[in-house]
Amino acid sequence: MPLTSWMPRGRPDAARPQGSVIEGEIVKMSPIGLRHAASVIALTRRLILAAGDRARLSPQNPVRLLGDTEPEPDIALIRPRADRYVRAPIGPRDVLLLVEVADTSYRYDRYVKLPLYARTRVREVWIVDLVHDVIEVHRRPSRDRYTSFAQVGPGDTVSPAAFPDIVLPVDDELLAH
């Protein structure tokens, strides 16, 4: 089902159903827990401060991957655009870094969403795994997977490929302890 089929008169600015749209299906996600929210808040703050005017940050907003796929990642670090995203939705080419914070949603984020991100050429995805206290860094999309993978944990640092000068410590604040 194309996304326009549930939009009044096909208007992209109309109210949309709650939840991600994955391959035409509306997927209701579990409510966000305290650790999940705290991690998103910490990452949002750090990325906004570090990126400054070089990028925009879109927390928990839809990203249009395909005609029938529009997930709502926890964070999308996106390129500035002249239209300020009023005329067209955020798409894969706009995304500099996409972040999914996962506790109960890890398997879904890793095995359903990540291949979709790779297939649509989202250049970099981080999965913040709150269960194992690590951040998975996925880069270089190829077909439905990423060819570069790294895992960082407490005491390490992580940097977006688009902004290697942004160095974030993987600490208790990011991992929400």
What are these regions (language model features)?
Residues 1-177:
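Gly/Pro/Ser/Thr-rich low-complexity, intrinsically disordered segments predominantly at protein N-termini
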